[in-house]
């Protein structure tokens, strides 16, 4: 099949309409990327429609070309398109989106609900905490998306909002106690860091509804008793969670975002999901 489309591309025909269902079927990841590239080039002079369950075929460089189909008991089947200006204003921003949204992060488009987190420690910790609460997030269709730092959380929240994807955001507050710092140079550095984090925190508070915004104070390391200077935070997070006896033993900072996203997608803890 790929050879047919490649040949069509090579002979430079224009004005065709292609409709392809599940182009990822029977293709390993490398071939999926290759096929996606061919279809993207074909779309320059033709119309290409694909339906997919593969994150590989989602190209956020042109977000206006992505249509998200969702189905639930309340609304039935709905289709959601976004305006380009809702997400990107410049070519530079479009290229950033293409870079940020890899296959793992593109999972959000297939999720019933999403928890946006800063880094790898949280990405590991929330599913583990869910299991301690007898909540298998995969079974409920919930994805934990690591955004590569606090500075990127707002971008992901804007994309989710534009496409109507239910989400919550979990971020470190990262505000240091200046009164506890005696060294003048260290205090000056901490003041600058506080100002930077305050700016990012304010931007998140201004965009994300309060009921969807959760803060680790001052950060996840403090909440979970992790050494900030270690290079093995995930192991320490695992040991912290492994020692917990059940849902009542999980810190509120971990528990509340999980419960909030479940409420947003209409799931009660006692409900059995449709497998």
Positions of PLM-derived features:
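Acidic, divalent-metal-binding catalytic cores of TOPRIM
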Residues: 67-275
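Switch/communication elements of ASCE P-loop NTPase nucleotide-binding domains
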Residues: 1-104, 271
């Amino acid at each position: 099949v790929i050879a047919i489309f490649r040949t069509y591309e090579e002979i430079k025909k224009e004005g065709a309409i292609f409709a392809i269902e599940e182009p990822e079927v029977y293709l390993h990841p490398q071939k999926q990327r290759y096929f996606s590239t061919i279809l993207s080039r074909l779309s320059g002079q033709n119309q290409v429609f694909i339906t997919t369950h593969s994150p590989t075929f989602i190209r956020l460089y042109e977000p206006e070309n992505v249509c998200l189909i969702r189905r639930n008991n309340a609304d039935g089947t709905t289709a959601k398109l976004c305006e380009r200006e809702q997400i990107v204003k410049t070519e530079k921003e479009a290229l950033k989106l293409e870079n940020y949204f890899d296959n793992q992060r593109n999972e959000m488009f297939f999720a019933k609900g999403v928890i946006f987190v800063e880094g790898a420690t949280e990405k590991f910790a929330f599913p583990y905490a869910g299991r301690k609460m007898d909540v298998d997030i995969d079974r409920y269709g919930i994805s934990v998306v690591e955004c590569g730092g606090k500075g990127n959380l707002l971008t992901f929240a804007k994309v989710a909002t534009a496409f109507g994807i239910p989400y919550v955001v979990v971020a470190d507050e990262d505000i240091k106690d200046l009164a506890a710092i005696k060294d003048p140079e260290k205090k000056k550095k901490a003041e600058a860091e506080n100002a930077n984090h305050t700016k990012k925190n304010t931007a998140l508070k201004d965009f994300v509804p309060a009921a969807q915004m959760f803060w680790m104070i001052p950060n996840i390391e403090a909440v979970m008793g992790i050494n900030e200077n270690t290079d093995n935070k995930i192991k320490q997070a695992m040991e912290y969670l492994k020692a917990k006896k059940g849902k009542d033993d999980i810190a509120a900072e971990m528990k509340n975002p999980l419960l909030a996203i479940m409420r947003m997608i209409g799931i009660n803890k006692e409900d059995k999901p449709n497998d």
